[in-house]
Amino acid sequence: MKMNYPIEYYKEKMKFLRDNSERYILPITCLCLTSVVITSCLFAALFVAVRDCKRDSFLEDTTTAITTSSSIATTYRDNLVIHCPRDWISHNGICLLSTGEKVGFRQGIQKCEKLGSDMIGKSEEEMKALKNIWTGNDHSRFWVDNRAAASTFDPVNECAYGTRSSVSEVPKVLTSPCSVRRYLVCKKTDNSYPTTQSSFYNQYE
């Protein structure tokens, strides 16, 4: 059975609903705005994280590429066989010339200088090519290329030379009077034109 309410009842009902709806409008609005702000912050943080990840990945790839290129360049340099003048022999990035004659220390320096080169100095690679040839150190603790001598000897009237009896033997640095004549080897560097590998050791086996 349908009930008929007086008009005042409906007016009170509408007033109640209007008053209560106004009470919740502000909290609901604040909640919506807060949700929008939080969502925006999350998206911003996600964007920054992805960007940093891509940047770090790019930097890592770039660093790896640079390191690899540097390693390749170093390997190529260390194994470089260069173009040398006629009668000179390429050996690990330097040109070597064995004159086949025995000379004193000072005479050896002069002969190499006339050829636009230096007398072979003391280094691990260069020592591998030595058998009984002058390497420097005239009255001082410095080699002919001005590097400090690491050996413990203190020559007064002697000069240093490299010697070994075979290719497999570790080269030794000894001293003898500078006037003693020994085989001379000059060196120069010219990395302009790579060429084919050749062996320096065979001359002294």
Swiss-Prot record:
Residue ranges of domain C-type lectin in the record: 84-187
Any one GO molecular function term: carbohydrate binding
Keywords, sorted A to Z: Lectin
InterPro entries, sorted: C-type_lectin-like/link_sf, CTDL_fold
Name of the protein in its database record: Putative C-type lectin protein FPV001/FPV260
Organism for this UniProt entry: Fowlpox virus (strain NVSL) (FPV)
